[in-house]
């Protein structure tokens, strides 16, 4: 699977981590917090994108 991911600066990454921690402090699960922040980043990011390939480990088993 290929996915276009935002290319973030270190500062942007730090802000994303802080946002995830804020959401978790409000009682949201870590997975849900990560998903929400990822969705926010994809919706608002205007910089470069990187392409990542994710392999399904269960494939061919």
UniProtKB/Swiss-Prot annotation:
It holds the Pfam family UPF0181. Disulfide bonds: none annotated. NCBIfam families: PRK05114.1. Belongs to the UPF0181 family. HAMAP family: UPF0181. This is UPF0181 protein KPN78578_22920. It comes from Klebsiella pneumoniae subsp. pneumoniae (strain ATCC 700721 / MGH 78578).
